[in-house]
From Swiss-Prot:
CDD domains cross-referenced by the UniProt entry: S14_ClpP_2
Keywords noted in UniProt: Chloroplast, Hydrolase, Plastid, Protease, Serine protease
GO molecular function: ATP-dependent peptidase activity; ATPase binding; serine-type endopeptidase activity
Gene of this entry: clpP
Active site feature: S101, H126
Residues annotated as transmembrane: none
Record protein name field: ATP-dependent Clp protease proteolytic subunit
HAMAP family reported for this sequence: ClpP
Organism: Psilotum nudum (Whisk fern)
Length: 198
């Protein structure tokens, strides 16, 4: 039997009594964002809306985006990345578990020097995929052209954010490349490994 989203007490400044809010709303008030699912239009719009609200509320307090995502749709992922670049506060990105495909793209979009992976996190990059398999020939050609444009956009962002040559990123994206936290740091996708002792 599902219990739903847990509720936690929260007291507004100046209030005597605490009210109950769902745990995500409480965390959002602390500027903690979570991407714990596939990237789609709905979660992208939620994250962008929260970032814009927090940006307007206080431009001086950083935001923290925790990522455990198998990836998802390309355009919603790019829109989350763009929103992270647009807001004034720094956005720290923290990979817990898996940041694959669009998840790793969003992870890379955190403020440089503030991109973190937990010690046992995994990161995966690859090229975007098409959804047209049984369309008209003209539709398939147009879709392929659009995918190539998106691939170029993603490749350029990875190259800029990791400081790797464009050709290296392009070659690596030809297949699924899985990385440990240390490998992701060496690659330039993250800057730090949390809880690291050495």
């Amino acid at each position: 039997m599902p219990i739903g989203v847990p509720k936690v007490p929260f007291r507004l400044p100046g209030e005597e009594d605490a009210g109950w809010v769902d745990v995500y709303n409480r965390l959002y008030r602390e500027r903690l964002l979570f991407l714990g699912q596939q990237v789609d239009d709905e979660i992208a719009n939620q994250l962008i809306g929260i970032m814009m609200y927090l940006n307007g509320e206080d431009e001086n307090r950083d935001m923290y985006s925790y990522i455990n995502s198998p990836g998802g749709a390309v355009l919603p992922g790019i829109s989350v990345y763009d929103a992270m670049q647009f807001v004034v506060p720094d956005v720290h990105t923290i990979c817990m578990g898996l940041a694959a495909s669009m998840g790793s793209f969003i992870l890379t979009g955190g403020e440089i020097t503030k991109r973190i992976a937990l010690p046992h996190a995994r990161v995966m990059i690859h090229q975007p995929a098409s959804s047209y398999y049984d369309g008209q020939a003209g539709e398939c050609i147009m879709e392929a052209e659009e995918i190539l444009k998106l691939r170029d956009c993603i490749t350029r962002v990875y190259a800029q954010r990791t400081e790797k040559p464009l050709w290296v990123i392009s070659e690596d994206m030809e297949r699924d490349i899985f990385m440990s936290a240390k490998e992701a740091r060496a690659y330039g996708i993250v800057d730090l490994i949390a809880l690291e002792n050495d």
